[in-house]
Amino acid sequence: MGRDEMQMSEAKRAYRSAKEEGNRQEEARWANVIGDILKNRGEYVEALKWFRIDYDVSVKYLPEKHLLPTCQSLGEVYLRLEHFKDALIYQKKHLELAKDASDLVEQQRACTQLGRTYYEMFLRSDDDHYSIRNAKKYFKSAMKLAQTLKENPATSRSSFLKEYIDAHNNIGMLQMELDNLEEAKKLLIRGLEICNEEEVSEDDDGRSRLHHNLGNVYMELRMWDKSREHIEQDIIICKKIEHRQGEAKGYINLGELHYRVQKYDEAILCYQKALNLAQSMEDEDALASQIDQNIETVKKAIEVMDELKKEEQNLKKLTRNMIIAKGTSQERKSLLQQNASLDCLIEKSSMIFAWLKHCEYAKRKKRIASELCDKGKLSDSFLVIGESYQKLRKFNKAIKWYTKSWEMYKSIGNLEGQALAKVNMGNVLDSNGDWAGALDAFQEGYRIAVEANLPSVQLSALENMHYSHMIRFDNIEEARRLQHEIDKLKESKSEDLEAYDVAKDCCSETDTEGNDHLPDVRSSACFSAEMSKSDSGRSKTLAGLEEVEDDEPLISFLRSSERLPKLKRAYVEKQNIPTEPRELTPKTLSKSTNSQQTGGGRKRIRVVLSDDEGDIDNEEGLKGRLQKCPVEGVATFDASRWFILLVWQDVPAADFKCTNSSENPINVEESTCSHKFTSSNPTNQYGNAIRCTGKVFIASDVNDDQCVTFRIDDDLIQLEVHSCICDDKLDIESLKVELACLYYLQLPKEKISKGLLPIIQHMKYGGRSLESFDAFKDQLGKDIIEVSIDGWVQKRLMKLYIECCKELSEAPNMKLLKKLYISEVEDEVVVSECELQDISVTPLLNALQTHKTVAMLDLSHNLLGNGTMEKLQQFFISSCQNYVDLTLDLHCNRFGPTTLFQICECPVLFTRLGVLNLSGNRLTDACGSYLSTILKNCKVLYSLNIENCSITSRTIQKVADALGAESTLAQLCIGYNSPVTGNAITNLLVKLDTLKSFSELNLNGLKLSKPVVDRLCQLAKTSCLTHLMLGCTNLGSDGSLQLVESLFSRAQESVKLDLSYCGLESTCIHKFTASVSLVHGILELNLGGNPIMKEGANALASLLMNPQCCLKVLVLSKCQLGLAGVLQLIKALSENDTLEELNLADNASKELTLQQNLSSVNSENLQPALKTSDGVSKEVDTDQQGLCAMNTDCNDLEVADSEDDKIRVESAASGFDNSCTSSCQKNSSFECQFIQELSSAIGMAKPLQLLDLSNNGFSTQAVKTLYSAWSSRSGAGPTWKHIKEQIIHFSVEGNKCCRVKPCCRKN
């Protein structure tokens, strides 16, 4: 380090001297040298600053050729920081400059860097085929250029040998990612041979890379000794050349090698050495974090190994007992116990990759199944044995046992088993190089799965077929067709696939032994770990059903064995609902960004295709990034553990719509990091509206019977109005806004330049005011609606935006225009949900540059990335505002950690930024230091939201460290991040306790331990908290009670409290409502997802009827209240003057009969008045009542035949019409009585503005009756309904349901 410091000192001295002299070339050169020294130290952020100085000086003062080295340096540093989009910008510029200069040397370097970047993107995306294509393209180009330069060196000093060797390394690691291990081994060995032939130094870094990757290849081939030899050689070289990052990653690989062979102590020692090296480098937080996770994984594996040893002892005991039970009535029971024990051992051995043991246990299971005469268990055991041999890379034996399994399943008619076996055979054939045979097997498995109606196995087979066509055969058209099939199947099974959303920190089974760790995109259909549960569960079922037969001799089962498979449970039922990771795999990272690969490849499911087949330039493909949660669902196939979670947007990458109001697709933007803009098609710019004079022209994509023609003055405007219709009601205001925007766009230039937009006042059809869609829906496209303008309003920003669109030849975004039109304050720019991307937002940002003044900028729910933030930074710097507080809402976009770096580089924001919302962006722990800087320097920042940003304890701790007593922070949201430890949260709470103005805290989704709850209670006592969001925190009844007591232990402002999904019970609710302070201290209360039952409804009804109750919002969805509880709560509102919103969705369980609810209603809730002192309703003997059941298939209320049909109840609520009674002649009077009682209660709930009754099984007629009651309430004003299938929302005009996303609600 002494030499480094001396070099740094000399370089800085030379830089200062060159700057003072005005020698720009030397100034840039020395800035680059300083950056290079810092880069080699691992101080990438600091290096980036110096490389940018080099870049800025070169751009301003030097010829273009001087940009070559600085673009190369910037690209490399951004790559090391994993800012891939930024890296691609400079690397592509580097390549362009090199081509312009005809410089083959620089072209080769640029191609190598581009290949590395796309390769790293592929490793992290798991579904980005464009990246792997680009990686292949650039690596092959780099190798050709290196070979050309080697054969024809530019100078005698430069042979380009090093680059030629690196090219072998790069393509070798790429082949390893594609599961072509033999080809990869051949290339890497050839690289070492070239080193020896050309007498390259033994300590050359090129050799270290080759050794590194060869170590990985041999590890996948289970050639442990050779793997260790190459990994250790890699470490030795890196140590000699002082390449700490490479040395650390070498130790990571060595640790994984020890882990694979169950040498856990040695593994931890290696990981600890790697951790020490990573921590000694400045900007290697991600590497250190990864190593920490690996150490934790090894510790868990040690626990599993201990459990396995205990279970082995149990199996030995059971085996001894079997000797005694042989020939007795206990023989079968003893065999079943051994089978269950072996299932457990198979599961645990697969978790720690002990495949030899796994094979041993599987064979013992086969023997037990034979003795049990159970063909179902026998076929299962064949499947597990096949898996063992597959993981041991004995593919011929694996095929043999999978074939046996398939034949056995076929003999007993088990279609599911046949399908699973076929898909597994395909996996083995693919690994063995028989790609055509693999595809045939996948197709056969799919055919069987379709025949048996097994959606999950169909999905697995389709994904494997997609992989084969895309990766193996490069058949894009067929892959696209299969992708469409996959999407349709996933959409139809969306509820089942939700079970795949598991902890993000579990390690992927794809990083396993044998095929596990290979870059295979194939999905898995068969498994061992989950089979153990499935099989164990099936054994219990068999045992339960045949318990009386356990004493029969085993010979008797030879006759009955053919019927046993009928009791067999489907594997896939278990497979699709994994609860925890089945295999514990340390994650390996790429050894170095210098053309090296990760320690282990990943499997991928499938590739998202778009129509772009050009340069395969698909940074855009990242915008719908599908994040995978690694889970052991099926042990035999590797890729099926990667399940899909859509993290950032609701819109898939290949399914973006055009940004104007037309339904016509336009060109998808090129890239978020591109600096070249793609213009939209200029024809029909405004999509669904065309201006004409005297004659109507209809756009070719517009259907006559879906269009309406409007006349404004002498102009006719035709547009589709379906976007303004909800439940047969026309949203008149939305229609007026769209008409105003369209009319303005067709005005002459001189009028547009004034920025005056029309105010649409009246719309008339046939002389009548337009109020209902029914009034004219039959005349669409035939008659003209007259529109009158009541005045004009100035919209300067809108005018500027349209001008900037014209300058860039871009079509204005209609959604954005409407947002700007309805904005009441010019300084508040709200353009959320406008489908904006880094390119399409450019006209707006250019308009803001001219507009200058902005107090609030809301860009949420778009598709924006770091490129937008760079432009925003330039806007804020150039803005003349320095003192006005700024609200910056960027949530739910595609921003990364660099976004925060841009904020840190903008001094203006230090004095202005008051609110910063970044939730829903994948910031990762790379943002930690930037967040810390923002919190320390932004003096007026009072609200920070980093919810669901993929950050961990490391970042939370940095946030805590950055908070000082002088901080103005009042609101903090950190929920739904993982993993966050209790210590990190506790440290944060301690710091928050020191803040003078802190009042709002959101910890939703974080698991809170007892010490954290205690610390939180202390904060509640000492701070004036007004918002406390604790949903899904596992608080429990005791923790919640403790917290509420602390919260109201002193005079307290009204509080908004979220305790949803915290495991609260009805007793807890009783204690809550007994608290006087709670009655008048809570404004909003969310108890959704807690099983408070009918008893809890009683307590809450008493709370609502209390005159001191000040609740405005009450959420009770999924609280198991039953229909009786729903009715009781709504009845209680007749005595409540404050509640405005009530959510009672999902409270009628499908497993409970309507009769039980209605009986309860009949016994208590249909009484004329509800007393505060009423206790829990009496239990009703359902045997004495009718068998009235809820028909959940048709979502209607129907009553089955019953002996008690003679029971009738007189119709009540005379104020309502007889529609219910007349339509229910065929149904029980209980149903009609209940609906009329509920309608009557709704009619009495006068202050209520929003009511959610979704998913409670109400029939269509019942909903109409309920809405009639809602709309007939006195003083309610105009009402609104949102009814679709089982969605039932009643609201009023000023408080429409679903108008704002939950994440966008402002306090």
UniProtKB/Swiss-Prot annotation:
TPR repeats lie at residues 28-61, 68-101, 109-149, 165-198, 208-241, 248-281, 283-308, 379-412, 419-452, 907-940. The keyword DNA repair applies. Changing Q72N: Slightly reduced interaction with histone H3.1. One of its GO terms (molecular function) is histone binding. Coiled coil: none annotated. Residues 1-20, 573-603 are annotated as: Disordered. Residues 587-597 have a biased composition (Polar residues). Changing E177R: Abolished interaction with histone H3.1. LRR repeats lie at residues 302-325, 564-587, 739-767, 856-879, 995-1019, 1079-1102, 1245-1269. SUPFAM superfamilies: RNI-like, TPR-like. GO terms for biological process: DNA repair; epigenetic regulation of gene expression; meristem structural organization; response to DNA damage checkpoint signaling. This is Protein TONSOKU. It is found in: Nucleus, Nucleoplasm; Chromosome. Gene3D superfamilies: Ribonuclease Inhibitor, Tetratricopeptide repeat domain. Changing D166R: Abolished interaction with histone H3.1. SMART domains: LRR_RI, TPR. One of its GO terms (cellular component) is chromosome. Belongs to the Tonsoku family. Signal peptide: none annotated. Histone reader involved in homologous recombination-mediated repair of double-strand breaks (DSBs) at stalled or collapsed replication forks. Specifically recognizes and binds histone H3.1 lacking methylation at 'Lys-27' (H3K27me1). It holds the Pfam family TPR_12.
